[in-house]
Amino acid sequence: MTKLAQWLWGLAILGSTWVALTTGALGLELPLSCQEVLWPLPAYLLVSAGCYALGTVGYRVATFHDCEDAARELQSQIQEARADLARRGLRF
């Protein structure tokens, strides 16, 4: 099962649970305070997921390490490839 399928299954389960609780399809009588919290819950979860994603991206950018050795190695491989292609008659 792919990661997308796992997320879609999770969203389907959460969404169907939310719909069942908000519409009263299960026959449960929730107190008014629970209903007031339950209605905007998807919006709260969406905002929370967005904040988490933004924080994760910000943290990863802030702690990103430069790989100077790998960059030098890649540049040398590019030069070798250009020299090889020039030997074979390709012009850039």
Curated annotation (Swiss-Prot):
Changing L14P: In MDDGC15; uncertain significance. Pfam families: DPM3. InterPro entries: DPM3. Pathway: Protein modification; protein glycosylation. GO terms for molecular function: endoplasmic reticulum-plasma membrane adaptor activity; enzyme activator activity. Keywords: Congenital disorder of glycosylation, Congenital muscular dystrophy, Disease variant, Dystroglycanopathy, Endoplasmic reticulum, Membrane, Transmembrane, Transmembrane helix. Disulfide bonds: none annotated. The chain crosses the membrane at residues 8-28, 37-57. The keyword Iron does not apply. It is found in: Endoplasmic reticulum membrane. GO terms for biological process: dolichol metabolic process; dolichol phosphate mannose biosynthetic process; GPI anchor biosynthetic process; protein O-linked mannosylation. It comes from the Eukaryota. GO terms for cellular component: dolichol-phosphate-mannose synthase complex; endoplasmic reticulum; endoplasmic reticulum membrane; membrane. It is a multi-pass membrane protein. PANTHER family: DOLICHOL-PHOSPHATE MANNOSYLTRANSFERASE SUBUNIT 3 (PTHR16433:SF0). Component of the dolichol-phosphate mannose (DPM) synthase complex composed of DPM1, DPM2 and DPM3; within the complex, associates with DPM1 via its C-terminal domain and with DPM2 via its N-terminal portion. This interaction stabilizes DPM1 protein. It is linked to Muscular dystrophy-dystroglycanopathy congenital with impaired intellectual development B15: An autosomal recessive, congenital muscular disorder characterized by hyperCKemia, myopathic features observed on muscle biopsy, developmental delay, mildly impaired intellectual development with learning difficulties, epilepsy, and mild white matter abnormalities. Muscular dystrophy-dystroglycanopathy limb-girdle C15: An autosomal recessive muscular dystrophy associated with a disorder of glycosylation resulting in under-glycosylated serum glycoproteins. MDDGC15 patients have muscle weakness, increased serum creatine kinase, dystrophic changes on muscle biopsy, and reduced O-mannosylation of alpha-dystroglycan. Belongs to the DPM3 family. Stabilizer subunit of the dolichol-phosphate mannose (DPM) synthase complex; tethers catalytic subunit DPM1 to the endoplasmic reticulum. This is Dolichol-phosphate mannosyltransferase subunit 3. It comes from Homo sapiens (Human).
